[in-house]
C-alpha cells in the first residue's frame, strides 16, 4: 500500500488520505470543490464541477496517471438538475470508452465539515 499526496489538490480535512494505491489500483477519496491554494470552496456550480475534476486530475498526475486510467466514478449532487452540466464537463475530460459511473442525488451536505453541492 502506498499513500499518494500532492499539494496541487486539497489537503485531507479528516482522517483519510487523498489517495491510496494498492496492487496497481489507485483509490481516490471523494473530492469537493476546494481550491487547494486557499482551501476555500469555489463559487458557482460549473466552477465547482470543474474544480472537483481538476483536484482529481492533480491526484492522478501525482501518481503518473491521467483520466484515461479512471475506470469508475461516483458523482453525488445535492440537486440532480446539475447532472447535465456534469455530463457536459465530463465529455470534455474523458474519451471513449468512458468510465463506469454512478450518480446520486444526496440530501444537503450542510452537516459535513464543508457543505458543498457536488462530490466526486
Located regions from the model:
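An amphipathic, aromatic/His-enriched active-site/gating alpha helix that lines ligand/cofactor pockets
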Residues: 83-103
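Glycine-rich phosphate-binding loops at beta-strand->alpha-helix junctions
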Residues: 74-81
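Phosphate/pyrophosphate-binding loops at sites that engage ATP/ADP/AMP, CoA/4′-phosphopantetheine
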Residues: 59-70
Amino acid at each position: 500500500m502506498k499513500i499518494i499526496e500532492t499539494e496541487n489538490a486539497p489537503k485531507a480535512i479528516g482522517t483519510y488520505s487523498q489517495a491510496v494505491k494498492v496492487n496497481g489500483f489507485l483509490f481516490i477519496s471523494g473530492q469537493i470543490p476546494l481550491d487547494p491554494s486557499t482551501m476555500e470552496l469555489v463559487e458557482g456550480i460549473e466552477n465547482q464541477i470543474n474544480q472537483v475534476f481538476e483536484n482529481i486530475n492533480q491526484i492522478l498526475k501525482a501518481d503518473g496517471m491521467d483520466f484515461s486510467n479512471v475506470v469508475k466514478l461516483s458523482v453525488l449532487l445535492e440537486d440532480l438538475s446539475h447532472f447535465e452540466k456534469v455530463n457536459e464537463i465530463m465529455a470534455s475530460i474523458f474519451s471513449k470508452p468512458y468510465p463506469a459511473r454512478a450518480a446520486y442525488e444526496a440530501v444537503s451536505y450542510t452537516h459535513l465539515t464543508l457543505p458543498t453541492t457536488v462530490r466526486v
